[in-house]
Amino acid sequence: METDNKDTYTLFINACVKKGSRTKRLADCFLSKLDGPVVETRLHETSFPLADEAFLNRRDSLIAKGDFNNPLFYLARQFAQADEIVVAAPYWDLSFPAALKQYFEQINVTGITFRYTAEGTPVGLCRAKRLTYVMTCGGTFVPEDYGFGYVKTLAQSFYGISDVRLIKAVGLDIDDADTEAILRKAEDQIRDNY
C-alpha cells in the first residue's frame, strides 16, 4: 500500500524477527481490534542507509532545500501521515532490537515528523494521536523507562503523539512459567481494554 497520500491507516512497525514471535502474537491481537487498513513495516526486511558523513550531508542538504518528497524520507512521511501507530518490539538487553533505533533515526526529520520553534523546542507534526507499544520479555526485570521510555519520550516530545500506551507480557522464560497462560491473559486484557 502506497502511503504518500491522505488515506487513513494504522502503521504497524514490526521489530520482531523470530517465527512464532510472542510479541508479534500480542500485536496481532491488538491490531485485530482496530478498524481500517494496516500498513506494516518489517524492520528486519528494511535496508537502512549507513549514517556516514556523505549520507548526513546529503540528508541535511535535502532538508535545507525542503525536498521532502525524496525517497530518502519515505519512512518519515509514512510515519507522519499514519492515523495510529503500533510498535511491536521484544525486550532485548534492557531495550529493543537495534533496527528499531535505526528506524527512529531514519524518521526523525525536521519538517516531516517535527519542527523546532524559534526557541529550539520540538513541536510534533504527526497526524497520529495514539502510539501503542507492544513488548514481551522472558524475565521480570523490565524498567519501563528503558526501551519503552525512549519511544514514549520521542512520541510525546518530538512527534506530538500524546497518548502512548504499553502492552506487555513478562516472565515468559522463568522456570516453571506457564508461558501460554501468561500470553492468553495478556490477549484477554487486550480484548477487554481496547
Per-segment meaning from a language model:
Residues 2-4, 142, 149-194:
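Glycine-rich phosphate/pyrophosphate-binding loop and the adjoining helix
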Residues 43, 136, 169-171:
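Active-site donor-binding loop signature of nucleotide-sugar glycosyltransferases
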Residues 109-119:
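Conserved nucleotide-sugar donor-interacting segment of glycosyltransferase catalytic cores
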Residues 17-18, 138-139, 171:
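Short, glycine/serine-rich, charged loops/turns that create anion-binding
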Residues 80, 98, 126, 159-162:
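Structured loop/turn residues at beta-strand edges in well-structured enzyme cores
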Residues 117-159:
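Short, glycine-/small-residue-rich phosphate/pyrophosphate-handling segment
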Residues 1-89, 94-109, 188-194:
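N-terminal beta1-alpha1-beta2 submodule of the flavodoxin-like/Rossmannoid cofactor-binding fold
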Residues 12, 87, 131-135, 166:
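Structural beta-sheet core signal
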